[in-house]
Amino acid sequence: MVNTVTPAGRPFVIASIMVATLMAAIEATIVATAMPTIVGQLGGFTYFSWVFSAFLLAQSTTTVIYGKLSDLFGRKPTLIAGIVLLLVGSLLCGFAWSMASLVVFRLIQGLGAGAIIPITATIIGDLYKLEERGRAQGMIAGVWAISGVLGPLAGALIVDHFSWAWIFWINLPLGVVTIIGLLLFLHESVETHRARIDYLGALLFSISIGALLVLLTEADAAPGALLALLGVVFVASGAWFLVHERHAPEPIVSITLWTRRLVATSNVATLLAGTALIGLTTVLPIYVQGVLGRSPMVAGTTLAALIVGWPLSVSFSGRLYRAFGIRRTLRAGSVLFPIGAAFLLFLGPQSSPVLAAVGSFLMGCGMGLISVTSMVTIQDSVEWSMRGSATASLIFARSLGSTLGATLMGTLLNIGITHYGSGALATKLHDLLNQPEGLIHLSADLSVRAVFDLALRWSFVGVVILAVLTFVATWLIPVGHRAVSAPAAGTQAPQPVSH
């Protein structure tokens, strides 16, 4: 495989990648604002959460599969195929006649969106040298930050002035622009050979991971028998998958790749960091509102510090590589991450939200450095034909960590409420948390607020422990690991990673 993008064409390729990323990044935030209107017109409130879960489950499950397909058939055709599938799902979502049909069409959207994040990151790894990659990835991280702010505003404007269908149809022009940009400016010369797609492996992987993600998502709501069945499906299909992959000619997941020390430790560190980070975003806003008694706007500002810190640190990572080396850059991120988490332990009912914002910002900076250094290190350790799979493994680990973190933090909060609250107080607290304006009333009730404060500390301790484990895992990453085998002639050789 040879990428023949000219220097003049690279800005157009990165612009196309940014538009593609925007489609994936804005999905959750733009839909959330419009959901009350959609439910009001379509009915079926019981499907509310599945409008989000279906998209995320499909996206997470297909990430690894798309990474492998991009190694077999090239980045451009695989990414375009994913975008087309996303656009088909978006078009159908606008014509949904019920919440059940909307969930199905969101599933189709997610199946397409699974291609965007791993393949765009892989294209950056293909086109940019090590010292340039941080700036390019910083631009992509900036798209995520902007999407977090603009998504809710765009959703509100569309619902107020147009049909809610346009929150999905807005993807159509964006997708067309992206496809045109990729067709015109991203050129690949694919080696002509008949690739054997591991259909059974892809099916088993999808069933196993899908069962795990549904199990984690519905752990506190589904009947015990269903959870047990999901657990059996996860274990059985997962075991079959592992046995099958060891003998498949072109395994959808290369066990050899995933068990390399560099890939394995990077994925573990990313999974732990993703778990800790979703823990922060889950519990910090409700603490600021329910315990500190601040407005949703203030609570959102504390998380905005995280959204600023992440892309900011990614943008400066290239300069840090050149000045201090990639190993020290990774170590700096691993130190900032638990320091930021430790700020949570000093929060109390009389604390300033600034304290929470500083901790959030430091965790964002740490996560940015950890994610970008792990990404470039993995990408530079493998040849072109494995780079898509390696990149996808890292993104999948972060996605799985996010799902684990949401479940873990909910469990810790419930344990804390049960431990610190008497029967009446615990019941009252649960009732308030289930009300739209419950956090406002909660902060005014001193006894309930005290229980909530203590209960949330269990979650804070969990975030700190995960951040410390992330620190340990990053120090186990063998930075400087070189490619095991030389790339084929005509491919971009891995760049050496400085110590």
Model-derived features: positions:
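Flexible interhelical linker loops that connect adjacent transmembrane helices
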Residues: V2-A8, V177-S206, A222, R246-A264, ...
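Interfacial helix-cap and linker-helix signal at transmembrane-aqueous boundaries
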Residues: I38-V39, L69-S70, A154-F162, L216, ...
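C-terminal membrane-cytosol helix-exit motif in multi-pass small-molecule transporters
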Residues: P173-V190, S206-E218, V233-H247, T470-P478
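Helix-loop-helix hairpins in multi-pass membrane proteins, especially solute transporters
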Residues: T63-L200, E218
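12-transmembrane solute porter fold
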Residues: R10-T33, T46-A54, K76, G142, ...
